[in-house]
Amino acid sequence: MLIALTGTPGTGKSSVAERLRERGYKVATVVELAEKHGCIIDEEDGEIVIDVESLAARIDFEGIVEGHLSHLLKPDVAIVLRCNPAVLRERLKGRNWSEEKLLENLEAEMLDVILVEALEHASEVYEIDTTEMSLEEVIEAVEAIIRGDREARKRYKPGGIDWLSELEDRIEEFMRKV
């Protein structure tokens, strides 16, 4: 089974994946798999450009794939980690990104971009709001979904997170200026 651990940068994917690996799960990053299968196209502004369609066609991995593109690999299950954009902004500020890149990611989170893409590419999709959860709580939620726990799968079904409604009077703070 291919499980995507995905979400906007800063939602906790790498931290969760690292701990899951320590607990014995088979975990790889999208970049590791892209390197293995020769699917890295280029590098732009310090970011690796991956031929995701080619990787999805070539992937032979069973386990958890971590990365904000992992949901595009046609996984059996996609677990989308989410975070309130107001909190996410603070998490991302330490990355020394340009204001444009910061806002691009906040906008993507606000508009459910990764969730919508996951719904298009994965057989099953779950979303976890990591905003006020400890790392251990997020890991427990992810493990429950992986185990097939019915309560967890019901609790984390997609559609329960709506940043636009929650932050409606602050939307402009998180959107790029046109």
Curated annotation (Swiss-Prot):
Its EC number is 2.7.4.3. The keyword ATP-binding applies. Residues 29-50 are annotated as: NMP. InterPro entries: Adenyl_kinase_AK6, P-loop_NTPase. SUPFAM superfamilies: P-loop containing nucleoside triphosphate hydrolases. One of its GO terms (biological process) is rRNA processing. It catalyses: AMP + ATP = 2 ADP; ATP + H2O = ADP + phosphate + H(+). Keywords: ATP-binding, Kinase, Nucleotide-binding, Ribosome biogenesis, rRNA processing, Transferase. ATP binds at G10, G12, K13, S14, S15, R95. Broad-specificity nucleoside monophosphate (NMP) kinase that catalyzes the reversible transfer of the terminal phosphate group between nucleoside triphosphates and monophosphates. Also has ATPase activity. Involved in the late maturation steps of the 30S ribosomal particles, specifically 16S rRNA maturation. While NMP activity is not required for ribosome maturation, ATPase activity is. Associates transiently with small ribosomal subunit protein uS11. ATP hydrolysis breaks the interaction with uS11. Belongs to the adenylate kinase family. AK6 subfamily. Interacts with uS11. Not a structural component of 40S pre-ribosomes, but transiently interacts with them by binding to uS11. This is Putative adenylate kinase. It comes from Archaeoglobus fulgidus (strain ATCC 49558 / DSM 4304 / JCM 9628 / NBRC 100126 / VC-16).
